[in-house]
């Protein structure tokens, strides 16, 4: 029986994201050339009406402020009847206010929280307690020191060619991404594929989803459905 992997977009709609992209002329970052499934995808996914979700702020949830600290309290979370853990952003972050929503590298665990191995172990331990793990995903914008800044065309610009923060917001610590740039959109989906395969994450809660074009989400869903053993 094929596994059902669902990716939840909180308060907007449910989406699924997996895609392998063309990397020609892309800015340099920590991306690998090929991904392999780590661990075993969860087969028994609860129905939407059965979900009991718990959001975890890694910095605040444990004294260590990291993945290991949260892992040590998984039994406490499970006792609440939780069957899905939503981790606030775990990717490397930057910017002047150290916000976890200012991503500087989509392919790296922030050193403050641990390593890829720590994340893999955390997810495996959650799965052993019948809890899924979804990652907060920040698709709309990045930190100003993100690796993608090597190509300014990946970002929204004003009439003078200056990269800008998201329009209509006071989020000046982040730069708005340009979803008209196909290379950027492809790389974004590729990064989401990385965590699903290399860490066995169960999905994503997508931040500021309504700022991102629906066409991007639709293309991402279609890409996911082509991946074997995940639907």
PLM regions and their residue ranges:
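Bacterial N-terminal signal peptides that target proteins for export
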Residues: 1-9
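Bacterial N-terminal signal peptides
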Residues: 9-18
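Bacterial Sec-dependent N-terminal signal peptides
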Residues: 17-42
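Substrate-binding/active-site clefts of carbohydrate-active enzymes
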Residues: 35-68, 72-84, 89-199, 219-231
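Short catalytic-loop micro-motif centered on adjacent basic/acidic residues
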Residues: 134, 203-209
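Outer-membrane beta-barrel proteins
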Residues: 207-213, 217
């Amino acid at each position: 029986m094929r596994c059902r992997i669902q990716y939840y977009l909180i308060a907007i709609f449910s989406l699924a994201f997996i895609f392998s992209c063309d990397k020609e002329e892309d800015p340099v970052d920590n991306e690998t050339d090929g991904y392999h499934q780590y661990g075993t995808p969860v087969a028994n996914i609860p129905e939407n009406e059965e979900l009991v979700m718990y959001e975890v702020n890694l910095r605040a949830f444990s004294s260590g402020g990291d993945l290991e600290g949260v892992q040590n309290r998984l039994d406490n979370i499970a006792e609440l009847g939780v069957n899905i853990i939503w981790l606030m952003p775990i990717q490397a972050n930057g910017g002047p206010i150290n916000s976890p929503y200012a991503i500087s590298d989509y392919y790296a665990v922030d050193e403050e929280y641990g390593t890829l191995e720590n994340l893999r172990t955390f997810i495996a331990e959650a799965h052993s307690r019948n809890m899924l793990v979804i990652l907060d995903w920040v698709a709309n914008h990045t930190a100003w020191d993100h690796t993608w800044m090597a190509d300014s065309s990946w970002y929204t610009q004003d009439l003078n060619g200056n990269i800008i923060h998201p329009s209509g917001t006071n989020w000046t610590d982040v730069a708005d991404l340009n979803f008209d740039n196909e290379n950027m959109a492809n790389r974004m989906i590729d990064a989401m594929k990385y965590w699903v395969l290399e860490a066995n994450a169960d999905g994503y809660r997508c931040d500021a989803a309504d700022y991102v074009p629906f066409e991007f989400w639709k293309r991402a869903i279609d890409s996911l459905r082509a991946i074997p053993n995940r639907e």
